[in-house]
Amino acid sequence: MSSGKRRNPLGLSLPPTVNEQSESGEATAEEATATVPLEEQLKKLGLTEPQTQRLSEFLQVKEGIKELSEDMLQTEGELGHGNGGVVNKCVHRKTGVIMARKLVHLEIKPSVRQQIVKELAVLHKCNSPFIVGFYGAFVDNNDISICMEYMDGLSLDIVLKKVGRLPEKFVGRISVAVVRGLTYLKDEIKILHRDVKPSNMLVNSNGEIKLCDFGVSGMLIDSMANSFVGTRSYMAPERLTGSHYTISSDIWSFGLSLVELLIGRYPVPAPSQAEYATMFNVAENEIELADSLEEPNYHPPSNPASMAIFEMLDYIVNGPPPTLPKRFFTDEVIGFVSKCLRKLPSERATLKSLTADVFFTQYADHDDQGEFAVFVKGTINLPKLNP
């Protein structure tokens, strides 16, 4: 994008990621789950009967797939690109099981590739209705294949391109699933997600919402560290200025994602009163931004697509966080995202405080995903509004 003409105004120099967990003194994922029987793990999660049944069915199917290799899979088509790799829909030839296979091409030593596959094996320990299921991983030449549960509704960034923006009630259900998924990863698997964004939130026609592409392999994270070529960043301000990754960083990314789902566009730079007025087809004086945030003194281009990558990163650090307009959204969701998007990590919400928030509790007991399931089914064959 910059072809050498843009300077890095932040002097970005992100700290290493692999050893951050081990330095914290926390148990590794393998240590955390190796000695706990599956039945006990599921009981501890407090799942509903439908959740337990669906998870058990997945594990039974998975039991029939002992190993994976290139010749065992038949590619059916491309599902999308994401985080350094292409994702294809595949069929396991022997069992007929449909999978999503992420293919990551890395020019690295064979020993490093094998170590990455070993680290990815921790995903076998993830048994949660809020985490996408894992079938296995293997290496073929310079390609690492990560085989996952197929979610027929695909990712929320794709859904968003089809419907424009999501109703608040569905964003409420998504919020519950994501917070519970992040909590499971942190408390049970002892890892942070590190890449929370709509494209890593998957949905299916059962109304389930699951996280994928989390940072279980430190070596894979490091191997892909120089491959960022995206036009968006969900990274928290403190990460862009060199601080270590914490759960607060995941919560910032989560909050930014929620705003995007609600307004239908990546919210950096933060929408102005004028843009919101156009979005909701009202006069500009009818737009009142939440949290008493006035028009920012920081004036970047209003269109995210026109921002160079380092302009965008500079805005995340120095510009105001996005805020939702009153009248068009409830006070509950406005307050919820505001708590996630505090610039200082020490002032940001925690996973525990989010679960006690009124917006979360409003949707926390909705076992019946029927309405959301119908919505997802209705989007599957829709064309994108802006292909």
From Swiss-Prot:
The active site is at D195. Activated by tyrosine and threonine phosphorylation catalyzed by MAP kinase kinase kinases. GO terms for molecular function: ATP binding; MAP kinase kinase activity; protein serine kinase activity; protein serine/threonine kinase activity; protein serine/threonine/tyrosine kinase activity; protein tyrosine kinase activity; scaffold protein binding. InterPro entries: Kinase-like_dom_sf, MAP_kinase_kinase, Prot_kinase_dom, Protein_kinase_ATP_BS, Ser/Thr_kinase_AS. Keywords: ATP-binding, Developmental protein, Differentiation, Kinase, Meiosis, Nucleotide-binding, Oogenesis, Phosphoprotein, Serine/threonine-protein kinase, Transferase, Tyrosine-protein kinase. It catalyses: L-seryl-[protein] + ATP = O-phospho-L-seryl-[protein] + ADP + H(+); L-threonyl-[protein] + ATP = O-phospho-L-threonyl-[protein] + ADP + H(+); L-tyrosyl-[protein] + ATP = O-phospho-L-tyrosyl-[protein] + ADP + H(+). Residues 73-360 form the Protein kinase domain. It holds the Pfam family Pkinase. ATP binds at L79, G80, H81, G82, N83, G84, G85, V86, V87, K102. SMART domains: S_TKc. PANTHER family: DUAL SPECIFICITY MITOGEN-ACTIVATED PROTEIN KINASE KINASE DSOR1-LIKE PROTEIN, SERINE_THREONINE-PROTEIN KINASE STE7 HOMOLOG. Interacts with ksr-1. This is Dual specificity mitogen-activated protein kinase kinase mek-2.
